[in-house]
Amino acid sequence: MGDVEKGKRIFIMKCSQCHTVEKGGKHKTGPNLHGLFGRKTGQASGFTYTEANKNKGIIWGEDTLMEYLENPKKYIPGTKMIFVGIKKKEERADLIAYLKKATNE
């Protein structure tokens, strides 16, 4: 898959303004991502999601995140995530490798 350290840098630059990853981390503009892998869309406890997120009904994993992170608004029309996405597949793979580790510690 990707490079965890490169993924961490991508997370800090592009994601950390709106998301946290640590267990017990607070929700910001976006939800805390701890426990993301294997969870259905729109299920982080204590965060208010759009109906689009709640109704998407997919399980987060490497493949679903790879597609989602390329263009979030295309993958889940109606999401309130304003991030435009990451076009480079390698950067998405690095970010996913980091998220897989960081959201499970």
Curated annotation (Swiss-Prot):
UniProt cross-references to InterPro entries, sorted A to Z: Cyt_c-like_dom (IPR009056), Cyt_c-like_dom_sf (IPR036909), Cyt_c_1A/1B (IPR002327)
Name listed for the protein in its UniProt record: Cytochrome c
Domain of life (superkingdom): Eukaryota
Keywords, ordered alphabetically: Acetylation, Apoptosis, Electron transport, Heme, Iron, Metal-binding, Mitochondrion, Phosphoprotein, Respiratory chain, Transport
Binding site for heme c: 15, 18-19, 81
Pfam family, one: Cytochrom_C
Transmembrane stretches, start-end: none
Residues modified as N6-acetyllysine: 73, 100
A GO term for molecular function: electron transfer activity
Organism: Ateles sp.
Function: Electron carrier protein. The oxidized form of the cytochrome c heme group can accept an electron from the heme group of the cytochrome c1 subunit of cytochrome reductase. Cytochrome c then transfers this electron to the cytochrome oxidase complex, the final protein carrier in the mitochondrial electron-transport chain.
Subcellular location: Mitochondrion intermembrane space
Example of a GO cellular component annotation carried by this entry: cytosol
PTM statement from Swiss-Prot or TrEMBL: Binds 1 heme c group covalently per subunit. Phosphorylation at Tyr-49 and Tyr-98 both reduce by half the turnover in the reaction with cytochrome c oxidase, down-regulating mitochondrial respiration.
Family as reported in the entry's similarity comment: Belongs to the cytochrome c family.
Family matches, as Gene3D superfamilies: Cytochrome c-like domain
Modification sites for N6-succinyllysine: 56, 73
N-acetylglycine: modified positions: 2
Modified residue annotations for Phosphotyrosine: 49, 98
GO biological process terms on file: apoptotic process
